[in-house]
Design a protein with these regions (language model features):
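Single conserved hydrophobic/aromatic residue that forms the stacking wall/gate
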Residues: 1-11, 194-199
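Hydrophobic/aromatic beta-strand patches that form the interior of the parallel beta-sheet core
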Residues: 90-92, 196
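Active-site nucleophile/metal-coordination loop of metallo-enzymes that catalyze phosphate/sulfate
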Residues: 14-89, 96-186
Length: 199
């Protein structure tokens, strides 16, 4: 079955060389990915190939590099992710759609298939731990990590009263601006653009 999947991917992609792991390997617990600006060692995860590096890398690509508490070199992230310089950028994010999900269904998306033919796109980026939407979206938006954003899951301890709070409706939760104090990359870009002298 595995050989059949590999051949199917190669047939659809032509030069595609990504080998989809067996399901038990995909579901196995792994150590958390590290943060930073360097490419991970062979077989390693994270560093420049992390969800938190995407927006700092894009900020560099559009000419306004925004470093964060865990990513000091947005230009290095841009190079690691293979992003060209651009005047503007559009980010399309689909919650829950991972690298292996895409690879196993490339026949359904000709555009994604064309992107995956580029070697720089033939490697996954890591997400944060825990990988819930609350933690991951704040990690993505700020270019930092759940420990800095204070957004660690759907339910967590409210530090103000010691009760469990819910972070979808913010029931029993601190005020959102009090809980999540890291500025987003978008907020920081807006500050740059509004304080820059106009031409």
């Amino acid at each position: 079955y595995r050989r059949q999947r590999q051949m199917c991917i190669r047939d659809r992609m032509g030069t595609m060389s990504v080998e989809v792991p067996e399901i038990d390997q995909l579901l196995a617990m792994t150590s958390p990915a590290r943060y930073g600006d360097e490419l991970p060692d062979e077989g390693g995860r994270g560093g420049a190939l992390h969800l938190s590096s995407v927006l700092p890398a894009i900020s560099s690509a559009i000419g306004h590099p925004i470093p964060t508490a865990i990513h000091a070199d947005p230009k290095r992230l841009q190079e690691a992710l293979g992003l060209p310089d651009a005047r503007s950028a559009v980010v399309v994010l689909v919650d829950g759609l991972g690298y292996w999900n895409i690879n196993m269904r490339l026949g359904h998306s000709p555009y994604l298939r064309s992107l995956m033919a580029d070697g720089v796109n033939q490697r996954p980026i890591a997400t944060c731990m825990p990988s819930t939407t609350v933690a991951a979206m704040s990690t993505f938006g700020t270019g930092t990590c759940p420990g800095l954003t204070g957004m660690t899951g759907y339910t967590q301890l409210n530090p103000d009263n010691g009760e469990i709070c819910q972070l979808i409706s913010f029931k029993n939760a601190p005020a959102p601006l009090k809980l999540q104090q890291q500025p987003t990359i978008f907020e920081r870009l807006a500050c740059l653009l509004y304080t820059s002298p106009s031409p």
